[in-house]
């Protein structure tokens, strides 16, 4: 059975070894038995539930299957089913028997039991997928009404409905791609149903669905194996020619050399340059060499034209490649060579890599392939099996399409006529596709299945035709009634009349029977004695027949349901002269539709009168029916004498006209004429027909024009048909109409200006337009003469019909045929041309059939081309122009020569009289045609001359100085300019440092202009370079020289006199090492037993080191101690040592950006196996500019955040020093127990929490609720007048019902988005500029704090302890020192930090309790509080607090204003800086914290580290702050990917450094976008003031002119710059006399320069008080501290005094009311007193405990102020 399994049993099987179904507890005891079961039954997909309890399951070997009650009949055994012919046909055996539906049901029943019980014998060879294919196959082959009996049909239908609901809304491209890669037959069927359903309703969904469905139905998802055959055959023929037919190489080599031209080719290649011009020159030379220039240009033009049509399909290639490897699983194979050979053979034949089920079959065939002979035999067996797999996939796909299309044949699915018509067209396309496959010799074994599929589609087509006919108007038949006495010969006359009307046998209807299944639908229908029964309503039946509305006949058989009456002629007989009484209600309708013929036989009547009672002799009847008298009544004559009264009153009042006598022949003619008249209709043609041409002339010239057009048709062998008048006759091409001016015509019109008989002679000169005197384009003329409708294949040939050949091609190879056919085709049709060429050569006796199929799929160009092919199988003539005609014969037909060019325009020019009648489109077409003709004549020469010019300009070498001027000292370039040694050095250094190529003259002129003070760009840059160079002018040293002349004291220069180059113009990608190594404190040397250096290792922490395997191989030592606990994963390894380095480096799985020496890294970071001197190593290829040496292995490659992502393990050596091999970091569990608490556990699975990807925690810390802000007792009634209110309190707050958790989640989502920031090289350059700028006032090597408690006391103790300890820091302190719980946490973190190990970077999340604008409260916007771990904060304070203090100490003059007191004279220094600027921009940013790029923050942290002492504490703090922060709330931990937490240590300084870096990057990019190279320090040319996201930029005119580009670059980095007042609009320069910075307006007042606090911030101090935590903020607090409240309001009055008397009086009244209602014990100051107190504090005369000493301290309860 296994050798005869069909495609449904072979395709998509999934191997699951039997041993996998056995429980692990029994594995050791039954190994031998399971091995036997594995070898004997390898294709089992699933084991039954009882298999685990038996060595050999009895259920799986039983041949009989008991009925489980699901079937209504007895089921034969599986053995009997396998012997049936239906099962044999399913297995593709060669038999001619038809499939039996009953056998199909039996097979399907067994399949259902096999799927349900899983102990069926079929399970030994079939998996679930194969059984499902069998059931779908049964569905496709059975009629739709019989499918309900198939088991699992309902389940499959439900599954398809679910797939339909899932995919119905998907776009067309998604469905087409999915149907190409899906391996689920149910899913494929559902997708096909969606595509076909939307194609049927394309009016609603778009025409592209119908077009795509038609195209996709003609495509098959298979690999065309025949394409390999001609290629392999050509190789064999070539090999035979070289070795057997022509073994003498002397005869072949000269031809080969002459063809290849190796010398010329070698010279071309030697002169090739890898540049654009070099490639153009080389390719042009090669095309010239092989004479393919013209055709190559044409091909390139065609490719460019079709590029945008093809680019949309490019993704299909990736999908196809990916589908080959989807689901592939490794197998435990023994004979690897034969498995590889079998897999390759399977791919070449089927186009698919074998999946696991097929791989099992391959293993069965190759089980004994242990020798070469047995392997070859097994491969031959496999080839036969593989050959069927390609066809099986085709039949599977056709089955799915058939099921999908047949399910659409449902009135509930396709309801309207348009959808039925499209369904009919799609069914015909699929039917034709299946029919084509039945003609394929390879598919012959599957013909029974294909015929059943065609039968199903025939049913769909028939049903659609019936549904169309029911809904459409039909032709009205003609009904004649032959009335007369019995025996006169009416019935015989009716039969004879039927033969004269049609060649078909007439249909017969008997109205005495109520079912009409015998009606055949032929053209003539006879109803004998139609009025013989009174029980039949024959009047209405006749009215229904003779009608334009469709008539559905009542049929009993199911297959005849919906049958329509379709006959053209109805002949009825009756013995009654009046079949319907005139008084009947239906008499008028009846007689209007019928014509009555009164039939009499005079011979019979006379015989009966003469001899009554005797039979009528045969002599009374004649064969020509001349014995009958046929009298045709007039219209609506109900009897011979009278006509129906129109009013229906007196039917005997109107006499009938005399009858018309006819014979049988004239009666037939009369009936035919009546049918034509009844169904005559006139339909107007809309629009302008594309293939209709009208030639307008006068009436007397019509005949002459007609003769001229016929002459043109004969001269050109044209395909058009000449018609006189607008009516069209049949034509294979266009139609040419001769018209008069008054005739209407829908087509292109041309006015004939010259028409005479003499014009016929002009046709000999091919001047068609001159002879006709019309002005038409050459394209229209070619289209008229040679256009062909559709594709026509002619098996018979008439020489007078053959066109004149333009090309004659003798086909000696496939390439000759393909090269010639390309002229006829568009670019899309060239692939079909090559395929057809293969078929013509391989099977020449089937040329017509194959060419018909090919031509139906091919699109031809609009150019007229005729080619005669002389092939081994005969002659093929192909003519194309829009469509194509082809003649294919098995004998020779010689028809060479003829027209070699298209018809030309003759002597008519656009300046003639016909030009005004020519439309503009034709005039421009004529122009473009002329330009194209000119280009075609010069295109080759133009390309060659262009390439020649490039080649000539390539070799223009500059003369090199010789002799005394070799070093270019002296005369240069023949200008007579001589330089001194110093001038020469200066000129060389200037060109080298600024990357210029100035001549001596230009250099001297530039130096002269710079000395004179010129202000142009070049002079300014030269002066900058000169000033930098002169800084080293005094770099001398006093030395004592002892020589022949004695002892001399001289000064010698210790350094070369050159400008100091800071490298500002060197980009990140251009930098080269070696430089300082990263993580210097964490890198150690690995040595051998003798102490010789082998490589490096990197400390990961806790005595664990990372290195590469070949470094630590053998006896390896670290710091004199042997390493231990070595573990490897590929080339990456880890080990332990008791020697611990002072610092540790963080590791991360990612792509590196820097090598160990600081140079940039270019890599794809895709691990592959590489062969090295140490063996094969799995690593990643990278390129850097640093040259490495032996012993560098193990050094770290880092990313932007300083994390180690790989280790150096090899290089390309001296030949390719830039090539590096890097081993990526992989996690190795060293089983170290964590010594510190950490919430975020990477080993836990990710979960989704309200849209955030996070880790679940063991404990839940909820977000604090309520607020401490309350309305003042003085404003319980009017608090709504204040612009601010306490922030939203959560879900119970009526102002905004948004929960606190939702607010936190919405605030965290921007932090989870990636923010790239500025480019790498730009950020790196600006970072160097900022470091140099800060170096002027920040000292180097600032020592870090070595005492943990000293660092702790530098922190603000009113803040949170972080996620590991609840409460604030001061809550865990006693007598000014931390308690045991806090001290233990600090000690654990400090111990790790002293080893340089990064700490967990985790924060607890809360919401800030503050006043917010009312509109933001209603939106639920609150600012988050990131509670930093107290241990991390202590370590960072120890590391960077000294650097931070040094930066903030210069806030008055530096770019960072952190630490400034805006109520001190410092504000005057800011005002002077602002006033000195040319343009001032005040900028604020929206959502600053969440839009920070991690790379920019890492660069700012590196700046702090640059000025530190680089101790392990600094390394730990730096690595901690660079790692991604983790936000902890509500029992989850979220690792964010961007942003800067507001609670990060030193957040104000880091934010301000970020601000400076962003602005510097934006300016740098804007300048260089204007082609201005930046070689100076930007921060020395403009001033900037930053405090976090607040900024004031003082730009010079140069920078202000590109401010739009600067702010545009800032936006491109992910920032959101806005105006300070948050108004909408571009950021523009502001008035320097009133600048807003830190919510202060810096302006001049009568008291001097002051920073005025925002008025709303002052006023809202009186409306709200801080008290106990509560949800009722509208009620005043229970307890008010009069001291702190009085101090708050006192300070508010002082700030109000700076705004003038009017505003102060308003505040004074509020203060008085507050004192009254709040029962305070202080007197508000007067205006003069407040002014005096504030000025005293400002100038430092009077000091107060609540004075704002720095912006980081609180005053005036600034948690209420929005500062």
Curated annotation (Swiss-Prot):
Positions of the record's site feature: Cleavage: 46-47, 331-332, 685-686, 960-961, 1071-1072
Domain called RdRp catalytic: residue spans: 1478-1603
Domain Peptidase C24: 1073-1229
Gene3D superfamilies: 1.10.260.110, 1.20.960.20, 3.30.70.270, 6.10.140.320, 6.10.250.3230, P-loop containing nucleotide triphosphate hydrolases
EC numbers: 3.6.1.15, 2.7.7.48, 3.4.22.66
GO cellular component entries: host cell endoplasmic reticulum membrane; membrane
One function term, GO molecular function aspect: ATP binding
Active-site annotation: 1110 (for 3clpro activity), 1131 (for 3clpro activity), 1193 (for 3clpro activity)
Annotated ranges, domain SF3 helicase: 458-614
Alphabetical GO biological process terms: DNA-templated transcription; proteolysis; symbiont-mediated suppression of host gene expression; viral RNA genome replication
Modified positions (O-(5'-phospho-RNA)-tyrosine) in chain numbering: 984
Residue stretches spanning the membrane: none
InterPro entries: AAA+_ATPase, DNA/RNA_pol_sf, Helic/Pol/Pept_Calicivir-typ, Helicase_SF3_ssDNA/RNA_vir, Helicase_SF3_ssRNA_vir, P-loop_NTPase, Peptidase_C24, Peptidase_S1_PA
SUPFAM superfamilies in the record: DNA/RNA polymerases, P-loop containing nucleoside triphosphate hydrolases, Trypsin-like serine proteases
Modified positions (Phosphoserine) in chain numbering: 1067
Phosphothreonine, modified sites: 1040
Region of interest (Acidic), residue spans: 981-986
SMART domains given in the database record: AAA (SM00382)
Record: residues binding ATP: 484-491
Keywords of the record: ATP-binding, Covalent protein-RNA linkage, Eukaryotic host gene expression shutoff by virus, Eukaryotic host translation shutoff by virus, Host endoplasmic reticulum, Host gene expression shutoff by virus, Host membrane, Host-virus interaction, Hydrolase, Membrane, Nucleotide-binding, Nucleotidyltransferase, Phosphoprotein, Protease, RNA-directed RNA polymerase, Thiol protease, Transferase, Viral RNA replication
Protein name listed in UniProt: Genome polyprotein
Organism: Feline calicivirus (strain F9) (FCV)
């Amino acid at each position: 059975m296994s050798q005869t399994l069909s495609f449904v049993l072979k395709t998509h099987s999934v191997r699951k070894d039997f041993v996998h179904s056995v429980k692990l507890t029994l594995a050791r005891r039954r190994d031998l038995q399971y091995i036997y079961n594995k070898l004997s039954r390898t294709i089992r997909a699933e084991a039954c539930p009882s298999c685990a309890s038996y060595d050999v399951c009895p259920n799986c070997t039983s041949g009989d299957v008991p009925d489980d009650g699901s079937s209504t009949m007895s089921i034969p055994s599986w053995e009997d089913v396998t012997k049936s012919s239906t099962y044999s046909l399913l297995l593709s055996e060669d038999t001619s028997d038809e499939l039996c539906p009953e056998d199909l049901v039996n097979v399907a029943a067994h399949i259902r039991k096999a799927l349900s019980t899983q102990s069926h014998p079929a399970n030994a060879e079939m998996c679930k997928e194969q059984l499902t294919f069998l059931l779908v196959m049964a569905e496709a082959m059975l009629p739709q009404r019989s499918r309900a009996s198939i088991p699992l049909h309902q389940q499959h239908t439900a599954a398809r409905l679910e797939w339909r609901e899932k995919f119905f809304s998907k776009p067309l491209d998604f469905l087409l791609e999915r149907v190409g890669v899906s391996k689920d037959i149910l899913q494929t069927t559902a997708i096909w149903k969606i595509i076909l359903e939307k194609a049927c309703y394309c009016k609603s969904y778009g025409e592209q669905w119908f077009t795509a469905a038609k195209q996709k139905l003609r495509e098959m998802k298979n690999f065309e194996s025949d394409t390999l055959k001609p290629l392999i055959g050509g190789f064999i023929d070539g090999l035979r020619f070289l070795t057997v037919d022509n073994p003498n190489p002397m005869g072949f080599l000269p031809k080969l050399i002459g063809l290849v031209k190796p010398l010329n080719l070698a010279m071309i290649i030697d002169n090739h340059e890898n540049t654009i011009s070099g490639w153009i020159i080389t390719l042009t030379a090669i095309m010239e060499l092989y004479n393919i220039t013209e055709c190559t240009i044409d091909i390139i033009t065609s490719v460019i034209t079709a590029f945008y049509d093809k680019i949309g399909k490019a993704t299909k290639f990736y999908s196809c490649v990916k589908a080959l490897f989807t689901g592939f699983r490794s197998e435990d194979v023994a004979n690897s060579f034969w498995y590889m050979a079998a897999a390759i053979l399977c791919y070449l034949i089927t186009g698919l890599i074998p999946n696991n089920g097929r791989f099992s079959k391959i293993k069965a065939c190759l089980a004994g392939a242990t020798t070469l002979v047995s392997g070859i035999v097994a491969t031959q067996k496999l080839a036969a099996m593989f050959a069927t797999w390609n066809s099986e996939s085709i039949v599977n796909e056709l089955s799915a399409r058939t099921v999908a299309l047949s399910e659409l044949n449902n009135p509930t699915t396709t309801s309207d006529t348009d959808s039925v018509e499209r369904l009919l067209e799609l069914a015909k396309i699929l039917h034709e596709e299946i029919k084509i496959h039945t003609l394929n010799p390879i598919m012959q074994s599957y013909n029974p299945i294909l015929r059943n599929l065609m039968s199903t589609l025939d049913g769909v087509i028939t049903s659609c035709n019936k549904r169309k006919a029911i809904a459409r108007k039909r032709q009205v038949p003609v009904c004649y009634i032959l009335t007369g006495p019995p025996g006169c010969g009416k019935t015989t006359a009716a039969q004879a009349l039927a033969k004269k009307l049609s060649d078909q046998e007439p249909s017969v209807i008997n109205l005495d029977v109520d079912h009409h299944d015998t009606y055949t639908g032929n053209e003539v229908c006879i109803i004998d004695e139609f009025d013989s029964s009174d029980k039949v309503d024959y009047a209405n039946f006749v009215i229904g027949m003779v009608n334009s509305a469709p008539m559905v006949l009542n049929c009993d058989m199911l297959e005849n349901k919906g049958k329509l009456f379709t006959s053209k002629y109805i002949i009825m007989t009756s013995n009654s002269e009046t079949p319907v009484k005139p008084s009947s209600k239906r008499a008028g309708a009846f007689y209007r539709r019928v014509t009555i013929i009164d039939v009499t036989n005079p011979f019979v009547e006379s015989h009966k009168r003469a001899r009554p009672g005797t039979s009528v002799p045969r002599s009374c009847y004649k064969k020509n029916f001349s014995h009958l008298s046929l009298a045709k009544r007039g219209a609506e004559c109900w009897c011979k004498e009278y006509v129906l009264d129109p009013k229906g009153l007196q039917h005997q009042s109107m006499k009938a006209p005399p009858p018309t006598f006819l014979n049988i022949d004239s009666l037939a003619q009369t009936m035919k004429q009546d049918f034509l008249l009844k169904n005559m209709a006139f339909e107007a043609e809309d629009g302008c027909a594309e293939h209709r041409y009208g030639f307008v002339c006068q009436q007397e010239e019509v005949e002459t024009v007609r003769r001229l057009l016929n002459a043109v048709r004969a001269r050109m062998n044209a395909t058009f048909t000449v018609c006189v008048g607008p009516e069209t006759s049949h034509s294979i091409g266009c139609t040419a109409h001769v018209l008069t001016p008054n005739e209407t015509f829908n087509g292109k019109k041309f006015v004939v200006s010259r028409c005479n008989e003499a014009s016929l002679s002009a046709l000999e000169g091919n001047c068609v337009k001159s002879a006709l005197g019309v002005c038409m384009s050459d394209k229209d003329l070619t289209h008229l003469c040679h256009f062909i409708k559709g594709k026509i294949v002619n098996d018979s040939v008439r020489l007078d019909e053959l066109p004149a050949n333009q090309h004659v091609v003798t086909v000696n190879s496939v390439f000759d045929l393909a090269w010639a056919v390309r002229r006829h085709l568009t670019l899309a049709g060239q692939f079909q041309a090559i395929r057809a060429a293969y078929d013509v050569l391989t099977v020449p006796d089937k040329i017509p059939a194959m060419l018909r199929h090919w031509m139906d799929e091919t699109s031809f160009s609009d150019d007229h081309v005729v080619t005669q092919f002389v092939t081994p199988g005969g002659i093929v003539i192909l003519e194309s122009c829009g469509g194509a005609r082809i003649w294919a014969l098995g004998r020779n037909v010689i028809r060479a020569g003829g027209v070699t060019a298209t018809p030309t325009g003759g002597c008519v020019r656009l300046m003639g009289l016909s030009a005004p009648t020519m439309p503009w489109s034709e005039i421009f077409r004529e122009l473009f045609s002329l330009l194209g003709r000119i280009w075609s004549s010069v295109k080759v020469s133009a390309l060659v001359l262009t390439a020649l010019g490039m080649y000539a300009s390539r070799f223009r070498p500059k003369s090199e100085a010789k002799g005394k001027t070799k070093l270019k000292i002296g005369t240069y370039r023949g200008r007579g300019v001589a330089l001194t040694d110093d001038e020469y050095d200066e000129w060389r250094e200037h060109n080298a440092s600024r990357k210029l190529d100035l001549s001596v003259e230009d250099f001297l002129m530039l130096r002269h202009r710079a000395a004179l003070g010129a202000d142009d760009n070049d002079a300014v840059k030269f002066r900058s370079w000169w000033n930098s160079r002169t800084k080293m002018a005094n770099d001398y040293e006093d030395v004592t020289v002892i020589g022949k002349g004695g002892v001399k004291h001289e000064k010698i220069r210790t350094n070369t006199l050159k400008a100091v180059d800071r490298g500002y113009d060197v980009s990140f990608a251009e930098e080269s090492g070696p430089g300082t190594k990263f993580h210097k404190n964490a890198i150690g040397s690995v040595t051998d037993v003798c102490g010789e250096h082998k490589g490096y290792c990197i400390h990961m922490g806790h005595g664990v080191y990372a290195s590469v395997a070949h470094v630590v191989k053998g006896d390896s030592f670290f710091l004199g101690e042997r390493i231990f606990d070595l573990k490897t994963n590929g080339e990456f390894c880890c080990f332990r040592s008791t020697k611990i380095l002072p610092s540790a480096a963080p590791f991360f799985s990612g792509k590196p950006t820097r090598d160990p020496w600081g140079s940039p890294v270019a890599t794809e970071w895709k691990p592959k196996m590489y062969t090295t001197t140490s063996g094969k190593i799995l690593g990643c290829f990278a390129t850097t500019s640093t040259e490495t040496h032996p012993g560098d292995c193990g050094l770290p490659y880092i990313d932007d955040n300083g994390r180690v992502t790989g280790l150096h393990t090899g290089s390309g050596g001296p030949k390719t020093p830039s090539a590096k091999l890097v081993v990526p970091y992989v996690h190795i569990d060293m089983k170290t127990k964590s010594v510190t608490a950490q919430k975020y556990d990477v080993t836990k699975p990710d979960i989704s929490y309200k849209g955030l990807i996070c880790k679940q925690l063991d404990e839940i810390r909820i977000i604090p609720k309520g607020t401490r802000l309350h309305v003042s007792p003085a404003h319980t009634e009017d608090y709504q007048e204040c612009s601010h209110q306490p922030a939203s309190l959560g879900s119970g707050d009526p102002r905004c019902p948004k929960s606190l958790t939702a607010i936190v989640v919405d605030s965290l989502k921007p932090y989870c988005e990636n923010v790239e920031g500025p480019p790498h090289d730009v950020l790196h350059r600006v970072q160097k500029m900022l470091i140099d700028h800060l170096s002027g006032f920040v000292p180097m090597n600032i020592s870090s704090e070595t005492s943990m408690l000293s660092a702790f006391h530098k922190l603000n103790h009113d803040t949170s302890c972080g996620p590991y300890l609840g409460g604030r820091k001061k809550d865990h302190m006693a007598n000014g020192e931390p308690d045991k719980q806090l001290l233990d946490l600090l000690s654990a973190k400090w111990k790790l930090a002293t080893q340089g190990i990064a700490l967990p970077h985790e924060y607890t999340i809360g919401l800030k309790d503050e006043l917010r604008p009312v509109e933001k409260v209603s939106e639920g916007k609150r600012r988050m509080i990131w509670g930093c771990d107290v241990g991390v904060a202590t370590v960072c304070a120890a590391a960077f607090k000294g650097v931070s203090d040094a930066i903030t100490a210069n806030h008055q003059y530096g770019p960072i204003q952190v630490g400034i007191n805006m109520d001190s004279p410092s504000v005057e220094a800011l005002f002077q800086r602002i006033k000195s600027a040319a343009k001032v921009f005040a900028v604020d940013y929206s959502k600053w914290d969440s839009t920070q790029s991690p790379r920019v923050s890492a660069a700012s942290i590196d700046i702090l580290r640059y000025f530190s002492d680089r101790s392990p504490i600094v390394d730990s703090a730096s690595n901690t702050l660079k790692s991604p922060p983790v936000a902890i709330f509500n029992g989850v931990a979220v690792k964010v990917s961007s942003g800067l937490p507001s609670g990060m240590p030193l957040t104000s300084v880091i934010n301000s450094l970020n601000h400076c870096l962003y602005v510097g990057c934006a300016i740098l990019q804007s300048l260089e976008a204007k082609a201005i190279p930046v070689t100076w320090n930007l921060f020395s040319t403009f001033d900037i003031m930053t405090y976090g996201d607040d900024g004031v930029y003082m730009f010079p005119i140069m920078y202000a002119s590109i401010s739009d580009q600067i702010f545009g670059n800032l936006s491109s980095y992910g920032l959101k710059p806005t105006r300070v007042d948050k108004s909408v609009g571009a950021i523009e320069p502001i008035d320097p006399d009133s600048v807003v910075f830190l919510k202060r307006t810096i302006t001049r007042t009568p008291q001097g320069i002051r920073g005025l606090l925002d008025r709303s911030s002052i006023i809202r101090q009186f409306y709200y008080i801080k008290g106990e935590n509560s949800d009722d903020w509208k009620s005043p607090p229970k307890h008010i501290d009069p001291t702190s409240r009085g101090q708050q309001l006192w300070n508010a009055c002082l700030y109000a005094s700076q705004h003038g008397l009017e505003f102060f009086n308003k505040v004074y009244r509020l203060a008085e009311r507050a004192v009254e209602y709040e029962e305070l014990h202080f007197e508000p100051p007067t205006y003069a007193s407040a002014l005096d107190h504030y000025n005293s504090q400002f100038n430092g005369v009077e000091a107060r405990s609540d004075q704002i000493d720095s912006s980081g301290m609180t005053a005036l309860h600034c948690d209420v102020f929005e500062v």
